[in-house]
């Protein structure tokens, strides 16, 4: 146990390592990756001790002879038992960590989509694939859209890419007052919490921008715009998951002055009470055939569907990992039974039944799986914290809302124990049949 504990401590100390800066301003979470490896290895080493402690604790309870025998074998903590549980711990830890990562990302993205698609209609240039490949929407068209009788307010977004101290970043033009007060935002730091530096333009910056240019607590960043170098200073920081380059949002008028452009990338239309969303959408599509006009709620569902498709592969990877680990458990049990041949022959001579042997094997498998689930869940929770609060933040510059999927983890434990039981029963029956 001393080596396992030392490994866990060493992994924790690795978190103190600075994250190396990469070209473009992003960072590589070197300490986080090393810590994850040490934690998994340390948990695997300690998992055998967990199995022994758990078995010895349960032996104090009065059980039948079959369960007593299974517990005594687990309590002995042979090298093969420890190896079997260690292999499962690695798989369980990775699956538990990924369950947290995917669940936290899903919950965070859903909240962000609620903010991003809070208007009723979303309008962009037809055929545009991104800010770098569009001409933008005509100012006259934007004026016609915002002045429509059914439209209450148009949240128009202007976008350009500018050079910054570390690579490129996004300079956005927004209705500054509306973004600060009227429109819902997911704030990392509320507007007004930071002091704007003298002779700098107040800006609402994304968390990625703030971390990339070290202005989480305020400061100044110089941007190379078409009219020369301009300084921005954050007055508030919002959460955004749309790009990893970061964005600084200034008022429309300032953006137009700095970029010498008049064309926005898109606009979100907030409709008046009682306005029929789809009817107005169809009307505007006929009036402006060059625009892509969509129901924002439907667009949100499409975006969520893309997200789900992207992360569906993680479920398959989790299943593959557990399947391989359970196959390792079965092979480990076969080796354990072969190693215990003399013990089984002695028990048979003493009148121990074939049925009792098979159930002992099944309970051994279940005990190994339970021990692995306990150890793997503990290290998996630590890995989830590491992925969300260290690796993800240093890699992408944004913070996810950490969500613990307790129900999924508990169900996973039940499935693990059942698979261990069934695998043990099947392995025991097959091995015993061969010996006969």
Can you say where each PLM-predicted feature lies in the sequence?
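Peri-transmembrane interface segments
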Residues: 30-37, 105, 109, 283-324, ...
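Hydrophobic alpha-helical transmembrane segments of multi-pass inner-membrane transport and secretion
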Residues: 3-6, 11, 78-103, 308-345, ...
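Alpha-helical membrane-protein architecture signal
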Residues: 63-71, 75, 82, 296-303, ...
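Membrane-embedded alpha-helical segments of integral membrane proteins
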Residues: 5-12, 27-59
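Basic-flanked hydrophobic alpha-helices used for secretion and membrane insertion
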Residues: 140, 159-199, 204-297, 304
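Short helix-loop junctions at transmembrane helix boundaries
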Residues: 12-34, 377-415, 425-435
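Juxtamembrane segments of multi-pass membrane proteins
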Residues: 39, 47-194, 207, 217-219, ...
């Amino acid at each position: 146990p001393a080596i396992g504990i030392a490994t866990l401590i060493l992994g924790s100390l690795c978190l103190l390592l600075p994250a190396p800066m990469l070209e473009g301003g992003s960072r590589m979470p070197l300490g986080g990756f090393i810590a994850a490896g040490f934690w998994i290895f340390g948990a695997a080493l300690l998992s055998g001790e967990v199995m022994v402690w758990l078995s010895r604790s349960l032996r104090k309870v009065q059980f039948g002879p079959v369960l007593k025998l299974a517990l005594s074998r687990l309590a002995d903590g042979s090298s093969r038992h420890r190896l079997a549980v260690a292999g499962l711990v690695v798989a369980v830890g990775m699956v538990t960590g990924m369950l947290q990562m995917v669940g936290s990302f899903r919950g965070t993205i859903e909240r962000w989509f609620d903010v991003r698609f809070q208007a009723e209609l979303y309008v962009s240039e037809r055929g545009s694939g991104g800010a770098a490949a569009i001409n933008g929407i005509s100012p006259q068209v934007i004026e016609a859209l915002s002045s429509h009788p059914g439209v209450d307010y148009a949240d128009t977004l202007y976008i350009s890419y500018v050079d910054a101290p570390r690579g490129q970043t996004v300079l956005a033009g927004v209705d500054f007052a509306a973004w600060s007060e009227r429109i819902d935002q997911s704030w990392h730091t509320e507007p007004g919490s930071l002091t704007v530096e003298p002779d700098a333009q107040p800006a609402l910056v994304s968390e990625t921008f703030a971390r990339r240019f070290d202005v989480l607590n305020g400061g100044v960043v110089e941007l190379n715009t078409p009219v020369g170098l301009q300084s921005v200073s954050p007055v508030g920081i919002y959460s955004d998951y749309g790009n990893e380059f970061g964005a600084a949002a200034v008022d429309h008028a300032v953006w137009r002055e700095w970029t010498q452009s008049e064309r926005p990338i898109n606009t979100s239309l907030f409709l008046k009470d009682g306005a029929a969303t789809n009817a107005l959408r169809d009307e505007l599509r006929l009036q402006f055939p060059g625009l892509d006009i969509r129901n924002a709620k439907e667009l949100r569902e499409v975006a969520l569907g893309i997200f789900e498709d992207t992360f569906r592969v993680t479920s398959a990877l989790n299943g593959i990992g557990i399947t391989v680990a359970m196959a390792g458990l079965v092979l480990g049990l076969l080796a354990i039974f072969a190693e215990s041949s003399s013990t089984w022959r002695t028990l048979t001579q003493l009148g121990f039944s074939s049925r009792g042997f098979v159930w002992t094997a099944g309970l051994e498998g279940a005990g190994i799986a339970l021990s692995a689930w306990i150890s793997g869940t503990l290290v998996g929770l630590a890995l989830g914290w590491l992925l969300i609060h260290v690796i993800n933040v240093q890699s992408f510059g944004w913070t996810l809302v950490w969500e613990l999927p307790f129900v999924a983890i508990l169900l996973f434990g039940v499935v693990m124990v059942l698979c261990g039981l069934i695998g043990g029963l099947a392995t025991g029956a097959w091995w015993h049949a061969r010996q006969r």
